[in-house]
Each structure stands twice: as structure tokens, then as C-alpha cells.
């Protein structure tokens, strides 16, 4: 399963540096981290792509207090996401 999401946050650069990059190594527990993509749309919007996602492990990671604290600290809020397979 693959995951694409768009999200809002207080400041994308700060979230990338002090949130995403800090916990990126933890992504190994729920996806193929070598393929993960983070892209800034503007100062408050971003897109993330994750591949070969294990939904059970992702749910566990999202429920962790440390993960929730990062989301709260940076005002991270997904605005759209999909687990649909990509097709041409």
C-alpha cells in the first residue's frame, strides 16, 4: 500500500527540520523509508509520499505520544490523503 498526503503546518521549514527529519528513521518500522518523499508547496503546505506502507505499524506510530507531540508542536494537520494505488 502507498500513501500520499497533503498537510498544513505552522511553518514547513521548521516542521521539516525539527519534526520530519528528527523522526524519519522511525519510518522504517512502517514503510520503505528509502523511497519516502517530502516536498514543500509553500510556507504552510506540504506533500509527503510513502511507499510499501504497513497500515498496522503506521497506526501504532501515529498513536505514539512523541509523534502526537511533534504534530501538536508544529500545527501539523493532514488536509488530504489517499491509500489508493496509483495507475496510469
Where are the regions that the model predicts?
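Short amphipathic alpha-helical segments and helix-helix/interface helices
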Residues: 24-27, 58, 67-68
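Short, flexible active-site loop motifs that bind/organize anionic cofactors or intermediates
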Residues: 5, 48, 57-58
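Alpha-helix boundary/capping residues
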Residues: 19-22, 65-66, 74-77
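Short amphipathic alpha-helices within nucleic acid-binding modules
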Residues: 14-18, 55-64
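Short amphipathic alpha-helix segments
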Residues: 14-30
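Short beta-strand segments enriched in hydrophobic/aromatic residues
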Residues: 9, 52-53
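Glycine-rich beta-strand-turn "strand-cap" elements at beta-sheet edges
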Residues: 8-9, 29-47, 69-88
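Short glycine-/aliphatic-rich beta-strand segments at the starts of folded cytosolic domains
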Residues: 1-11
Amino acid at each position: 500500500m502507498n500513501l500520499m498526503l497533503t498537510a498544513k503546518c505552522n511553518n514547513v521549514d521548521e516542521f521539516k527540520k525539527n519534526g520530519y527529519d528528527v523522526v524519519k528513521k522511525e519510518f522504517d518500522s512502517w514503510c520503505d523509508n528509502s523511497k519516502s518523499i517530502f516536498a514543500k508547496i509553500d510556507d504552510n503546505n506540504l506533500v509527503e509520499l510513502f511507499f510499501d506502507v504497513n497500515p498496522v505499524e503506521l497506526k501504532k506510530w501515529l498513536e505514539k505520544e512523541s509523534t502526537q507531540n511533534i504534530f501538536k508542536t508544529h500545527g501539523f494537520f493532514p488536509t488530504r490523503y489517499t491509500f489508493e494505488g496509483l495507475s496510469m
